[in-house]
A protein has these predicted regions:
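N-terminal lobe of the biotin/lipoate ligase/transferase fold
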Residues: 1-96
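Short beta-strand elements
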Residues: 135-136, 149, 252, 259-277
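Structured beta-strand/loop patches that form or line metal/cofactor-binding pockets in enzymes
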Residues: 222-266
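Internal, well-ordered alpha/beta segment that forms a basic, Gly-enriched binding/recognition surface
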Residues: 114-179
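A conserved active-site cap/scaffold subdomain adjacent to cofactor or substrate pockets
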Residues: 158-159, 168-214
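Contiguous, small/hydrophobic- and glycine-enriched helical/loop subdomains that border
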Residues: 79-122
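Active-site- and interface-proximal helix/loop "cap" or "latch" segments in soluble metabolic
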Residues: 184, 269-329
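Flexible, glycine/charged-enriched surface loops at secondary-structure junctions
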Residues: 113-121, 209-222, 299-303, 314-317
Protein backbone atom coordinates (compact mmCIF):
# COMPACT_ATOMS: atom_id res chain seq x y z
CA UNK A 1 0.00 0.00 0.00
CA UNK A 2 1.03 3.59 -0.69
CA UNK A 3 -0.36 6.85 0.68
CA UNK A 4 -0.87 10.17 -1.09
CA UNK A 5 -0.38 13.45 0.77
CA UNK A 6 -3.16 15.88 -0.18
CA UNK A 7 -3.07 19.37 1.36
CA UNK A 8 -5.86 20.85 -0.80
CA UNK A 9 -9.09 22.05 0.86
CA UNK A 10 -10.98 22.51 -2.43
CA UNK A 11 -13.85 19.95 -2.33
CA UNK A 12 -14.18 19.51 -6.11
CA UNK A 13 -10.41 19.19 -6.53
CA UNK A 14 -10.21 16.63 -3.75
CA UNK A 15 -12.93 14.53 -5.37
CA UNK A 16 -11.07 14.85 -8.68
CA UNK A 17 -7.80 13.72 -7.07
CA UNK A 18 -9.52 10.76 -5.43
CA UNK A 19 -11.22 9.83 -8.72
CA UNK A 20 -7.91 10.02 -10.59
CA UNK A 21 -6.19 7.75 -8.09
CA UNK A 22 -9.13 5.35 -8.37
CA UNK A 23 -9.49 5.23 -12.14
CA UNK A 24 -5.98 5.95 -13.43
CA UNK A 25 -3.35 4.79 -10.92
CA UNK A 26 -4.27 1.17 -11.59
CA UNK A 27 -0.70 -0.10 -11.23
CA UNK A 28 -0.89 0.72 -7.53
CA UNK A 29 -2.60 -2.22 -5.82
CA UNK A 30 -3.61 -0.20 -2.76
CA UNK A 31 -3.69 3.54 -2.06
CA UNK A 32 -4.59 5.56 1.03
CA UNK A 33 -5.47 9.28 1.14
CA UNK A 34 -6.42 11.65 3.97
CA UNK A 35 -8.03 14.97 3.05
CA UNK A 36 -9.92 17.92 4.52
CA UNK A 37 -12.49 20.09 2.70
CA UNK A 38 -13.55 23.66 3.25
CA UNK A 39 -17.33 23.90 3.98
CA UNK A 40 -19.09 21.70 1.42
CA UNK A 41 -21.91 19.26 0.83
CA UNK A 42 -20.83 16.07 -0.91
CA UNK A 43 -23.80 14.28 -2.50
CA UNK A 44 -23.97 10.62 -3.47
CA UNK A 45 -23.65 9.51 -7.08
CA UNK A 46 -27.35 8.63 -7.46
CA UNK A 47 -28.88 11.54 -5.55
CA UNK A 48 -31.08 14.33 -6.87
CA UNK A 49 -28.85 17.14 -5.59
CA UNK A 50 -31.45 19.88 -5.33
CA UNK A 51 -33.60 17.69 -3.05
CA UNK A 52 -30.71 17.03 -0.67
CA UNK A 53 -29.57 20.59 0.04
CA UNK A 54 -31.00 23.85 1.31
CA UNK A 55 -29.73 25.78 -1.70
CA UNK A 56 -30.57 29.22 -0.35
CA UNK A 57 -28.49 28.47 2.72
CA UNK A 58 -25.56 26.93 0.84
CA UNK A 59 -25.44 29.88 -1.59
CA UNK A 60 -25.62 32.46 1.19
CA UNK A 61 -22.87 30.78 3.22
CA UNK A 62 -20.53 29.90 0.34
CA UNK A 63 -20.91 26.16 0.90
CA UNK A 64 -19.64 24.25 -2.13
CA UNK A 65 -21.79 21.40 -3.46
CA UNK A 66 -20.00 18.51 -5.19
CA UNK A 67 -21.09 15.07 -6.41
CA UNK A 68 -18.86 12.07 -5.65
CA UNK A 69 -18.41 8.75 -7.46
CA UNK A 70 -19.90 6.52 -4.75
CA UNK A 71 -23.51 5.92 -3.74
CA UNK A 72 -25.03 6.68 -0.36
CA UNK A 73 -26.35 9.91 1.11
CA UNK A 74 -25.30 13.56 1.23
CA UNK A 75 -22.80 14.63 3.89
CA UNK A 76 -21.60 18.01 5.18
CA UNK A 77 -17.85 18.68 5.38
CA UNK A 78 -15.88 21.54 6.88
CA UNK A 79 -12.29 22.19 7.94
CA UNK A 80 -12.80 20.13 11.11
CA UNK A 81 -13.98 17.09 9.17
CA UNK A 82 -11.42 14.41 8.25
CA UNK A 83 -11.94 12.27 5.16
CA UNK A 84 -10.10 9.09 4.30
CA UNK A 85 -9.95 7.00 1.13
CA UNK A 86 -8.72 3.45 0.59
CA UNK A 87 -8.40 2.20 -3.00
CA UNK A 88 -7.74 -1.46 -3.77
CA UNK A 89 -7.48 -3.80 -6.75
CA UNK A 90 -8.88 -6.57 -4.52
CA UNK A 91 -12.49 -5.67 -5.23
CA UNK A 92 -13.85 -9.20 -4.95
CA UNK A 93 -12.32 -9.90 -1.54
CA UNK A 94 -14.23 -7.28 0.40
CA UNK A 95 -17.12 -6.20 -1.78
CA UNK A 96 -19.45 -4.09 0.34
CA UNK A 97 -17.78 -5.11 3.60
CA UNK A 98 -17.48 -1.62 5.06
CA UNK A 99 -16.51 -3.10 8.41
CA UNK A 100 -13.08 -4.32 7.30
CA UNK A 101 -11.97 -0.90 6.11
CA UNK A 102 -13.23 0.86 9.22
CA UNK A 103 -10.94 -1.10 11.56
CA UNK A 104 -7.98 1.36 11.46
CA UNK A 105 -10.33 4.17 12.53
CA UNK A 106 -11.80 2.10 15.37
CA UNK A 107 -8.29 1.09 16.47
CA UNK A 108 -7.07 4.71 16.50
CA UNK A 109 -10.00 5.78 18.68
CA UNK A 110 -9.38 2.84 21.03
CA UNK A 111 -5.81 4.11 21.50
CA UNK A 112 -7.31 7.48 22.46
CA UNK A 113 -9.66 5.91 25.01
CA UNK A 114 -12.86 5.90 22.94
CA UNK A 115 -14.88 2.79 22.11
CA UNK A 116 -16.36 3.01 18.61
CA UNK A 117 -18.37 0.35 16.80
CA UNK A 118 -19.64 -0.46 13.33
CA UNK A 119 -23.46 -0.37 13.05
CA UNK A 120 -26.20 -0.40 10.43
CA UNK A 121 -25.26 -0.67 6.80
CA UNK A 122 -22.41 1.83 6.74
CA UNK A 123 -22.09 3.77 10.01
CA UNK A 124 -19.54 4.11 12.78
CA UNK A 125 -20.95 5.13 16.16
CA UNK A 126 -19.92 6.08 19.68
CA UNK A 127 -22.63 5.33 22.27
CA UNK A 128 -25.28 5.12 19.56
CA UNK A 129 -24.27 8.41 17.93
CA UNK A 130 -22.92 8.43 14.38
CA UNK A 131 -19.56 10.06 13.68
CA UNK A 132 -18.63 8.47 10.37
CA UNK A 133 -20.43 7.37 7.24
CA UNK A 134 -18.76 5.19 4.63
CA UNK A 135 -19.34 4.46 0.96
CA UNK A 136 -17.80 2.41 -1.82
CA UNK A 137 -17.49 2.59 -5.59
CA UNK A 138 -16.30 0.05 -8.16
CA UNK A 139 -14.51 0.53 -11.47
CA UNK A 140 -13.09 -2.21 -13.70
CA UNK A 141 -12.38 -4.62 -10.85
CA UNK A 142 -11.07 -1.86 -8.60
CA UNK A 143 -12.74 -0.69 -5.41
CA UNK A 144 -12.71 2.67 -3.64
CA UNK A 145 -13.83 2.90 -0.03
CA UNK A 146 -14.06 6.28 1.68
CA UNK A 147 -15.39 7.71 4.89
CA UNK A 148 -15.99 11.12 6.42
CA UNK A 149 -15.14 11.50 10.09
CA UNK A 150 -17.00 14.18 12.05
CA UNK A 151 -14.14 15.46 14.20
CA UNK A 152 -15.28 18.92 15.30
CA UNK A 153 -17.79 19.86 12.62
CA UNK A 154 -20.15 22.84 13.12
CA UNK A 155 -23.39 20.98 13.90
CA UNK A 156 -25.54 24.10 13.54
CA UNK A 157 -24.45 24.49 9.92
CA UNK A 158 -24.76 20.76 9.23
CA UNK A 159 -28.42 20.84 10.31
CA UNK A 160 -29.24 23.86 8.13
CA UNK A 161 -27.27 22.99 5.00
CA UNK A 162 -28.71 19.49 4.55
CA UNK A 163 -32.31 18.48 4.03
CA UNK A 164 -33.22 15.25 5.78
CA UNK A 165 -36.37 13.60 4.49
CA UNK A 166 -39.09 12.81 7.02
CA UNK A 167 -39.09 9.14 6.04
CA UNK A 168 -35.39 8.80 6.87
CA UNK A 169 -35.75 10.39 10.29
CA UNK A 170 -38.77 8.20 11.05
CA UNK A 171 -36.98 5.06 9.87
CA UNK A 172 -34.13 5.80 12.28
CA UNK A 173 -36.57 6.42 15.14
CA UNK A 174 -35.03 9.76 16.12
CA UNK A 175 -36.12 13.38 15.91
CA UNK A 176 -33.37 15.30 14.14
CA UNK A 177 -30.02 15.30 12.37
CA UNK A 178 -28.24 16.67 15.44
CA UNK A 179 -29.67 13.95 17.69
CA UNK A 180 -28.12 11.29 15.47
CA UNK A 181 -24.52 12.49 15.27
CA UNK A 182 -21.56 13.34 17.49
CA UNK A 183 -18.16 14.97 17.12
CA UNK A 184 -15.13 12.82 17.91
CA UNK A 185 -13.52 15.69 19.84
CA UNK A 186 -16.44 15.71 22.28
CA UNK A 187 -15.81 12.05 23.12
CA UNK A 188 -12.02 12.27 23.61
CA UNK A 189 -10.67 12.15 27.20
CA UNK A 190 -7.75 14.31 26.02
CA UNK A 191 -8.40 16.85 23.26
CA UNK A 192 -6.39 17.15 20.07
CA UNK A 193 -6.73 18.99 16.74
CA UNK A 194 -8.08 17.50 13.54
CA UNK A 195 -4.58 17.57 12.04
CA UNK A 196 -3.15 15.72 15.04
CA UNK A 197 -5.94 13.17 14.71
CA UNK A 198 -5.15 12.83 11.00
CA UNK A 199 -1.52 12.08 11.87
CA UNK A 200 -2.66 9.37 14.31
CA UNK A 201 -4.83 7.74 11.62
CA UNK A 202 -1.84 7.67 9.25
CA UNK A 203 0.35 6.17 12.00
CA UNK A 204 -2.25 3.46 12.60
CA UNK A 205 -2.44 2.70 8.89
CA UNK A 206 1.34 2.21 8.91
CA UNK A 207 0.88 -0.32 11.73
CA UNK A 208 -1.74 -2.19 9.69
CA UNK A 209 0.46 -1.91 6.56
CA UNK A 210 4.15 -1.86 7.67
CA UNK A 211 5.42 -1.68 4.08
CA UNK A 212 3.36 1.44 3.25
CA UNK A 213 5.29 4.23 1.49
CA UNK A 214 4.35 7.60 -0.03
CA UNK A 215 3.20 7.92 -3.65
CA UNK A 216 4.26 11.36 -4.89
CA UNK A 217 2.00 12.75 -7.62
CA UNK A 218 3.96 13.65 -10.76
CA UNK A 219 3.49 16.80 -12.83
CA UNK A 220 1.57 14.67 -15.34
CA UNK A 221 -0.66 13.30 -12.57
CA UNK A 222 -1.39 16.81 -11.31
CA UNK A 223 -2.19 18.09 -14.81
CA UNK A 224 -4.68 15.27 -15.38
CA UNK A 225 -6.31 15.85 -11.98
CA UNK A 226 -6.68 19.55 -12.82
CA UNK A 227 -8.28 18.65 -16.16
CA UNK A 228 -10.90 16.37 -14.60
CA UNK A 229 -11.53 19.02 -11.94
CA UNK A 230 -12.29 21.61 -14.62
CA UNK A 231 -14.18 19.37 -17.05
CA UNK A 232 -16.16 17.18 -14.65
CA UNK A 233 -16.11 17.58 -10.89
CA UNK A 234 -16.30 21.38 -10.71
CA UNK A 235 -19.11 21.65 -13.29
CA UNK A 236 -22.81 22.39 -12.78
CA UNK A 237 -23.81 19.51 -15.06
CA UNK A 238 -21.96 16.93 -12.96
CA UNK A 239 -23.24 18.21 -9.63
CA UNK A 240 -26.84 19.08 -10.50
CA UNK A 241 -27.56 17.57 -13.91
CA UNK A 242 -30.85 18.02 -15.72
CA UNK A 243 -34.16 18.07 -13.86
CA UNK A 244 -36.18 15.05 -15.04
CA UNK A 245 -39.44 15.36 -16.96
CA UNK A 246 -41.99 13.10 -15.32
CA UNK A 247 -45.67 12.32 -14.90
CA UNK A 248 -45.32 9.89 -11.98
CA UNK A 249 -43.11 10.28 -8.89
CA UNK A 250 -42.52 7.54 -6.32
CA UNK A 251 -40.43 7.55 -3.15
CA UNK A 252 -39.80 4.32 -1.25
CA UNK A 253 -37.42 3.67 1.65
CA UNK A 254 -36.07 0.24 2.50
CA UNK A 255 -33.50 -0.76 5.16
CA UNK A 256 -30.85 -0.75 2.39
CA UNK A 257 -31.68 2.79 1.25
CA UNK A 258 -34.15 5.10 -0.44
CA UNK A 259 -35.21 4.94 -4.09
CA UNK A 260 -36.92 7.91 -5.76
CA UNK A 261 -38.19 7.44 -9.29
CA UNK A 262 -39.49 9.97 -11.81
CA UNK A 263 -41.24 8.23 -14.70
CA UNK A 264 -42.52 9.92 -17.84
CA UNK A 265 -45.48 7.72 -18.80
CA UNK A 266 -47.57 8.13 -21.97
CA UNK A 267 -50.46 5.81 -22.84
CA UNK A 268 -49.34 3.51 -20.02
CA UNK A 269 -45.85 3.10 -21.55
CA UNK A 270 -42.62 4.27 -19.89
CA UNK A 271 -41.05 6.89 -22.17
CA UNK A 272 -38.26 7.70 -19.74
CA UNK A 273 -37.40 7.22 -16.08
CA UNK A 274 -34.84 8.74 -13.73
CA UNK A 275 -33.75 6.91 -10.58
CA UNK A 276 -32.26 8.67 -7.56
CA UNK A 277 -31.48 7.62 -4.01
CA UNK A 278 -28.95 6.92 -1.28
CA UNK A 279 -28.63 3.23 -2.12
CA UNK A 280 -25.36 1.46 -2.92
CA UNK A 281 -24.49 -0.58 -5.99
CA UNK A 282 -21.70 -1.50 -8.35
CA UNK A 283 -23.52 -0.76 -11.62
CA UNK A 284 -24.67 2.52 -13.14
CA UNK A 285 -28.43 2.99 -12.73
CA UNK A 286 -28.58 4.52 -16.21
CA UNK A 287 -28.54 0.87 -17.36
CA UNK A 288 -31.84 0.32 -15.52
CA UNK A 289 -33.29 3.57 -16.84
CA UNK A 290 -32.56 2.52 -20.42
CA UNK A 291 -33.83 -1.02 -19.82
CA UNK A 292 -37.27 0.22 -18.76
CA UNK A 293 -37.94 2.49 -21.76
CA UNK A 294 -40.87 1.08 -23.72
CA UNK A 295 -42.06 -1.19 -20.91
CA UNK A 296 -45.76 -1.00 -19.89
CA UNK A 297 -46.14 0.94 -16.63
CA UNK A 298 -47.49 -2.04 -14.71
CA UNK A 299 -45.85 -3.79 -11.76
CA UNK A 300 -45.74 -7.25 -13.37
CA UNK A 301 -44.27 -5.88 -16.62
CA UNK A 302 -41.61 -3.86 -14.83
CA UNK A 303 -40.77 -6.82 -12.56
CA UNK A 304 -40.46 -9.18 -15.53
CA UNK A 305 -38.08 -6.77 -17.29
CA UNK A 306 -35.97 -6.29 -14.16
CA UNK A 307 -35.67 -10.05 -13.74
CA UNK A 308 -33.75 -10.21 -17.01
CA UNK A 309 -30.75 -8.70 -15.20
CA UNK A 310 -29.08 -8.96 -11.78
CA UNK A 311 -30.56 -5.95 -9.98
CA UNK A 312 -28.34 -6.49 -6.91
CA UNK A 313 -25.45 -5.10 -8.94
CA UNK A 314 -27.29 -1.76 -8.91
CA UNK A 315 -29.23 -1.95 -5.63
CA UNK A 316 -27.24 -3.79 -2.98
CA UNK A 317 -29.29 -5.74 -0.41
CA UNK A 318 -32.60 -5.12 -2.21
CA UNK A 319 -34.77 -7.72 -3.93
CA UNK A 320 -35.91 -7.32 -7.52
CA UNK A 321 -39.47 -7.09 -6.21
CA UNK A 322 -38.52 -4.18 -3.95
CA UNK A 323 -36.92 -2.35 -6.85
CA UNK A 324 -40.01 -2.90 -9.01
CA UNK A 325 -42.27 -1.56 -6.24
CA UNK A 326 -40.13 1.57 -6.06
CA UNK A 327 -40.88 2.22 -9.73
CA UNK A 328 -44.57 1.29 -9.94
CA UNK A 329 -47.11 0.41 -7.24
Amino acid sequence: MKYIVNTSNDPAYNIALEAYAFRELVDEDELFILWINRPAIIVGKHQNTIQEINKGYTDAHDIKVVRRLSGGGAVYHDLNNLNYTIISNKADEGAFDFKIFSQPVIATLADLGVKAEFTGRNDLEIDGKKFCGNAQAYYKGRMMHHGCLLFDVDMSVLGQALKVSKDKVESKGVKSVRARVTNIVDELPEKCTVNEFSDKILEKMKEFYPEMTEYVLSEDDLAKIQESYEKQFNTWDWTYGQSPEYTVERNVRYPAGKISTYANVENSIIKSVKIYGDFFGIGDVSDIEELLVGVPYEYEDVLAKLKTIDTTLYFSHMTTEEVAKAIVA
